[in-house]
Amino acid sequence: MAAPDAMTSLVKSSVALLSSAHESLPTSLAAMKTAETAPSSTFGILGRVILSILSVLPTLLFWVSYTLPTWLFTLFSMSLTFTMNFTTLMLVLVFVVSTISYFVRYRYLTMYARLPPEPQREEPQVEVFPESQEGDSKRGLSNYLDEFLSAIKVFGYLERPVFHELTRTMQTRRLAAGETILLEEEKGFCLVVDGLVQIFVKSNREESDSDEDDGELQGESGGGSAQAHRQGYQLLTEVKNGAPMSSLFSILSLFTEDVKLRHDEDSGPSSSTPMSPQHRPSMTRNSSFNMDDSRPETPIEAQEATIRRRRTSALASPTAGGRLSNVPPLSLDTDGFNDNFKHSKQRRSPSRSTKPKSAHPDIVARATVDTTIAIIPATAFRRLTRIYPKATAHIVQVILTRLQRVTLATSHAYLSLTNEVLRTEKLMNKYTTYDLPGFLRDAPLERLKEKFTKETERLGSDEGMKGIALHNPGAGRRRRTSVSIRSSTAAQARLAAARGTSIGSNVEAISRLTSPEQGMRNDRISAGDLLTNTQMSRGTGRSGRSSFSQPYQHDVRRDARTPLDASGFNPFASPSMRPNLHRQESIDEATVFRESVLGCMFKAIGLTSPENPVPRPAASVEQSPRLVSFDAKRQKAIFTSAFGFMDPYEASRDGDADSVASASNLSTLSASGNGNLLEEVVNDVEIVFFPKDAVLVEQGERNPGLYYVIDGFLDVSVAVEEDSSESNVLGTLPTGPAVTEDDLFGPPLQPTATNTSLRNGENSKKKRSRKSLFMTRPGGLAGYLGTVSSNRSFVDVTAKTDVYVGFLPRASIERIVERYPVVLLTMAKRLTTLLPRLIQHIDFALEWVQVNAGQVIYNQGEESDAIYIVLNGRLRAIKDAENGKVTVIGEYGQGDSVGELEVLTETARPGSLHAIRDTELAKFPKTLFNSLALEHPGITIKISKIIASRMRALVDDPLHEQSKERSNKATRTNVSSTVNLRTVAILPVTAGIPVVDFASRLMNALNQIGVPRGVVSLNQAAILNHLGRHAFNRMGKLKLSQYLADLEEKYGMVLYVADTPVKSPWTQTCISQADCILLVGLAESSPNIGEYERFLLTTKTTARKELVLLHAERYCPSGLTRKWLRNWPWINGSHHHMQMSFRATAEPVHQTGRRLGNAIKQRVQVIQAEIQKYTSKRVRQTPLYSADTPFKGDFHRLARRLCGKSVGLVLGGGGARGISQIGIIRALEEAGIPIDIVGGTSIGSFIGALYAWDADVVPMYGRAKKFSGRMGSMWRFALDLTYPSASYTTGHEFNRGIFKTFGNSQIEDFWLEFYCNTTNISKSRSEIHTSGYVWRYVRASMSLAGLLPPLCDNGSMLLDGGYIDNLTVAHMKSLGADVIFAIDVGSLDEDTPQAFGDSLSGFWATFNRWNPFSTHANPPTLSEIQSRLAYVSSIDALERAKNTPGCRYMRPPIDPYGTLDFAKFEEIYEVGYKYGKGFLAQLREQGVLPVTEETEKEKNLRRTMAPRRASI
């Protein structure tokens, strides 16, 4: 028992121990938990997870290995039997099939119906931000100054010292209402500061100048005094605030009073030359104000001088009382005025022979209200001429340019006063004819002709017509750079000036060379053959060239006027002659000819030789011209001649003039230093031979240079169009070839030129007859006016016989004009002398107007009082509709005219006219027209022709017919929006876009396309290089605007590249000067508004804005363009997709740290790129099928769009017959004809959309063939049949076929611009679709009524567009397309005569259809009648399309094929391809194709810019 007890006690003790341990366990665990909380909890959770997995795992294994197999065995061992009849089975089967068909048909296959809605983009409204105009009356000092500054803008840019010098002696006068002044007596520049002045001219005056001999041009300007009071006066114009009362002629006369008309070596000073200083001792302080005039004082002048000396503000009145009564409108029969006027005429009659010609002949001014005028006296202009000669030349250049562009061009092209304008060309010959020396007339000339004859025989007649130039060994040794010349000769020029060296000594050598004595020396030298002595001069530099002055150094020393001249340093002599004065070298005859021709040219343009020097003042005065004595009381400078300080060969030695008035010009003109002028220019002279009938200068082009006739005769003529009925004088409507506006402003950038060449063969080359004006004999100069003034020629210059001429390029003339202002002043003097008085009166009334961007010129409903001609800039005419919307009537660019119809019919303005940008206008007042019409009825006839031609254009214009009764937005808002664009701004969306590279490529494309007069690209660097660092400050803004206006007039198109930060002045200038703004963005970047767009919106510009999206690859993802256009509602032009390789981001900066991580990341990116090559969709960068032509690029497409030379493709509807259009497009591609815009109707919209998508033939062919296969399946058509309530089919299969072709692509994403038309039967009109999902509007355009149901779009039902217009040529023309290829594949109309009587039996009609012996035509069926009714309006539109200018109508022979013959795809395709090849070959034979190479012929017109160098 002991053992069990012991065992029991042991158990009890163990239990007690375990219980105590159990009781102490929580405390120990708690302690451990507090010690190691985190690790114990983590391991505890992990342990529990492991234990639970181990506990569940056996259960799971048992279920999988035993339970599941048992259940499956039991299930598959069971037997289940269902019993049902056939009806139940069929119902179940039908239910299942229907359910599946429903989900497949209406859920899966109708994805096209569940696309997110993308409605058509609304056309943006016309932006109008007019400036508030307060009328003509302004008050306040600031407005007073504004009026004065606006009046003197006619002088162009005036620097501050020049402005102060011009206005320091200005006088302000006050005219009472009705007070009259004789502008003929006013010596100065008059302008109206406040008030209104009427200008009158004698109306009954006999224009005797036109009947007199040419030598009598400087006759006196009025009738006798007895007839003065019987002369009626005609209102010429009204001068308002800020307008000058003086004309451009009067300004030129003030500057050129002391300039000689002709410089003869053997003649003394002419009557126009002022007295020398020693003959004018009486010029003292007691001299009156007008003492410098070469005529005695009249009582009126004495009275005026007295009043001026007393400094009164009242104007001298012709009457004793100082005030006149009101002058009647057409006569000035006031007694007091007539008596005084008669008395003054009698007093002045003895001195009439010495009276200079007045700048204001027969002009009277009358103040309508109390008026304030300002007068800048003539002395201010003389002093300005002396102190700032280059500034004077600049002003004269500006005035001459405006005189030509405003007065002469308007008179010539607009008023039909061609004879009056061209008289100047003829009469100028007597001032510019200088014969060559006699020793060059015989043997040397014969040897010259012999060499040219041999070369002509070798080259042939075609090459010879371009001109053959004599080999010029010195042509390669042109002038040094401007920097080196300026640095090396600036000090030399001042040293020569200090020593009194005459620059005119250069001509001295020429004069001796052309003397008979020198001719004998030349005979002794025996020049021999033309290249006898050129081998020695070819290999040497400039110093080694045989100078024309070297063989005659003894004569130079002998003829020197002073020892200082002989021994002094001459900076203008050649470097080779200075160290060795006795070097003798022979001269070849070519050099003698060039130097002689150059000497005669210099005399003709006004550069005198020192035998008859212009009188010079004392040397002391010359050294300090700013210290000229000036009498402040008499406001009279005590000096002699207006050119006393400016020798004709003096290149502006005045330091102040150089630094102030010409510093910026010298920094940009190449080779403008003061080197030896003859040495520099003689190498530019070419001896050129032109055969008979060769054209040297064409009417309307810039003169290549000066032509000096050595032998032969030149015919100066004007071209006359034989058929000018289609011409539109100033080019506002592109209806025909503009002829006279080419002479006015050069060829316009509009679709008129190409239209002429792309019409019928007989119309493409119109015969132009020439009206001969005069002949230029040997010794005469051709191209003088146009070359010196840098304007276009009014005349044609052709070779009447075989002619040998000396040619000096325009660039050399421009250098001479810039350095020697007397050349311009001489031409201005001759112009003011020769132009008839009628032109002067027109110049007086024509007003040069400068308006700011957004400024309103006239408002809708105002009285029409003037015609406006655009000199540069752009205008937009708008009309406010009754519903509050603004519509564009038209836009007018350079050379266009506005307002003739309203002025002639005396009706109110039909709309408002405002300036899109800063614009210069010529204002032609109605009063001037009325005045001229009385004496020159031809003016009325000319204007009537203009109005009649415009009315005819409106009647014949298909666009006008289309928009007259329909409200087609696309046709109406884009009227003339791309016509005659002259300035284009390239603006980036945000920083970092390569606009400079873009502009460079665009400019190259524009040059290849062929813009008339060329293209120039401007960026900030170019402007700063030309105008200096002050180009954008307040002082340089006027100078900058004038420079930009000159560039716009000189070039056909100006590109402004905004390559500066956002708010820089240059960016603002680019925006303000643009006719069209191209916003360039990267397609893959964010479409959010960039900083440049925000700045653009703040400028409130109304210019046309177009979006350009640059793609790295030739692919545009669907919906990308819509994202851009959705955020940019102000894009009122089109958008362009262009491929351009660029670097989107800059090179990343490599970090120095974590090199291993960067290397791994870079390696991963490389691997991903390699994988994407094989997994992603590859996008081709070039078209699969492309002809070898450079004109199909994206930049050429944009260039043609900007120039108005776009090529459009219009595809008509006709069902399966439209497959032939694919073959014709392939033929166009192979011919190298680019397509820029695509439009289509019905099947044409489908084919056109396929081509516009990628601009590629191969994918278009594949997709079209796939679609034809679907349409050719009769099973698909049968399965789509439905109950014919609205149509025979549901349209689902048709929708599926189109959607599978285009997917969710949108029209905006197409690479080419595309549109399609539909017929809106809800609103009974045609609609044009240019945005939205492609498949919807292509489907709508193909919806044949009855076969397909209409497509619902925004509540409207759309059907086939061919019901109204099956060939949308009119809309394509409105988009700016110049050449249009229209392909018509519609069915022919059945026009067989019918005679079935007044009633018709259906049984008889059916029997007659099957009766082969019937003689009656088959009557139309009901469906045929409905079809003919539907296409009634389309037939009329088709006939108008065929007659549209520039349209090439094509109809392939596809009549045997039906509308649904899609199964004959290959056959129809081959028919179209063969027809296209034959049609284009025919056009090529007619000389019409290629379209893009027409500019090569135009380049050859400038034959003498780069004459052929024949190594004779």
From Swiss-Prot:
Intracellular phospholipase B that catalyzes the double deacylation of phosphatidylcholine (PC) to glycerophosphocholine (GroPCho). Plays an important role in membrane lipid homeostasis. Responsible for the rapid PC turnover in response to inositol, elevated temperatures, or when choline is present in the growth medium. A nucleoside 3',5'-cyclic phosphate 1 binds at residues 669-793. Belongs to the NTE family. A motif (GXGXXG) lies at residues 1213-1218. It comes from Phaeosphaeria nodorum (strain SN15 / ATCC MYA-4574 / FGSC 10173). A motif (GXSXG) lies at residues 1240-1244. A motif (DGA/G) lies at residues 1360-1362. Its EC number is 3.1.1.5. PROSITE patterns: CNMP_BINDING_3, PNPLA. This is Lysophospholipase NTE1. Residues 343-358 have a biased composition (Basic residues). It is found in: Endoplasmic reticulum membrane. Keywords: Endoplasmic reticulum, Hydrolase, Lipid degradation, Lipid metabolism, Membrane, Repeat, Transmembrane, Transmembrane helix. Residues 268-291, 751-761 have a biased composition (Polar residues). Pfam families: cNMP_binding, NTE_Ploop, Patatin. GO terms for biological process: glycerolipid metabolic process; lipid catabolic process. It is a multi-pass membrane protein. The keyword Endoplasmic reticulum applies. InterPro entries: Acyl_Trfase/lysoPLipase (IPR016035), cNMP-bd_dom (IPR000595), cNMP-bd_dom_sf (IPR018490), NTE (IPR050301), NTE1_P-loop_dom (IPR056556), PNPLA_dom (IPR002641), RmlC-like_jellyroll (IPR014710). Residues 208-217 have a biased composition (Acidic residues). It catalyses: a 1-acyl-sn-glycero-3-phosphocholine + H2O = sn-glycerol 3-phosphocholine + a fatty acid + H(+).
